[in-house]
Amino acid sequence: MMSLSGSSGRTIGRPPFTPTQWEELEHQALIYKYMVSGVPVPPELIFSIRRSLDTSLVSRLLPHQSLGWGCYQMGFGRKPDPEPGRCRRTDGKKWRCSREAYPDSKYCEKHMHRGRNRARKSLDQNQTTTTPLTSPSLSFTNNNNPSPTLSSSSSSNSSSTTYSASSSSMDAYSNSNRFGLGGSSSNTRGYFNSHSLDYPYPSTSPKQQQQTLHHASALSLHQNTNSTSQFNVLASATDHKDFRYFQGIGERVGGVGERTFFPEASRSFQDSPYHHHQQPLATVMNDPYHHCSTDHNKIDHHHTYSSSSSSQHLHHDHDHRQQQCFVLGADMFNKPTRSVLANSSRQDQNQEEDEKDSSESSKKSLHHFFGEDWAQNKNSSDSWLDLSSHSRLDTGS
């Protein structure tokens, strides 16, 4: 009991703070009073605190950091660098660069710009020369060889007329020239110039217009001497029977066929070599579109409907063309258009009657094809519509 009481007395008699600590507490309590009262703290109280920092007590409370402020440079949560002067480039595992770090940098000279794109090389810009692509187009030149050739659209000649057309449109173009669309006579030119056309006119030089095309095979492209305009036929894959209605020449009026506007088409068949050689009718019907005219005197029959000034020129033109072969050209194309025929028939009625008399001897062989009433109505003075309607009904029956 004595020992316990003696030990407890010793602990109670010992002060809780040392005199230095007590002095420090009093100094802090005084500063606190100034702060609570709102009065500025005297500077001597602050200086005393600064001096006390150098004491052993302060050194124990705030231990000296050997790294200094390096922790703020490395950032929070990072481990301190065990080797400060070494390059910090690693592979993410155990390997680390052994070189010395560059001054004011964490990496050496080799790894300093590793993050940047060092593979930038001066690429030589090769100037590629672009050649202009020219679309080839099908052209026909006005010479003795009318075979189609491919010519560039960028270098166009004035001596060649370019057509972008198919083979069917070529045949239609040859038929249109044979039909009188070239404008050889003055009446024909006046007719087509008075009507508005939707297709452009390719121009030709006068030297080319004087040349004529002699085609021994399937095509014949003809350009007359006084021709100032030609038709550029669209490249449509239509049948040959639709070419007679092209450019509004043979319009279908009330569903009337070609015999309404071309009643003289059947008459030209009598002048053909098929009739003179007395070939069977089945042969003519099987091959009606390949008609070769060798007798130029009988070809000139359809020129009697033109004016006297133009007929002399056409007669001279056909003397040079003694043999021509037309593909997809029916015999009705040997005759001029309905409007030209109507205008010229008033002036040359005597010549028309002579032609009827000359061809009357050869009508009987084709009566089984056109009907018996056709020959009677042919000599009558009915209108063209009546004649064609009778012939159409006869052939339909």
From Swiss-Prot:
Consequence of gene disruption: Small and narrow leaves.
Subcellular location: Nucleus
Positions with biased composition (Basic and acidic residues): 288-298
Pfam entry (one): QLQ
Tissue: Strongly expressed in actively growing and developing tissues, such as roots, upper stems, and shoot tips containing the shoot apical meristem (SAM) and flower buds. Also expressed in mature flowers, but weakly expressed in mature stems and leaves.
QLQ domain boundaries: 16-51
Motif, Bipartite nuclear localization signal: chain positions: 78-96, 114-121
One term of GO molecular function: ATP binding
Start and end residues of each WRC domain: 81-125
Family: Belongs to the GRF family.
Role this protein plays: Transcription activator that plays a role in the regulation of cell expansion in leaf and cotyledons tissues. Acts together with GIF1 for the development of appropriate leaf size and shape through the promotion and/or maintenance of cell proliferation activity in leaf primordia.
Subunit structure comment from the entry: Interacts with GIF1.
Descriptive protein name: Growth-regulating factor 5
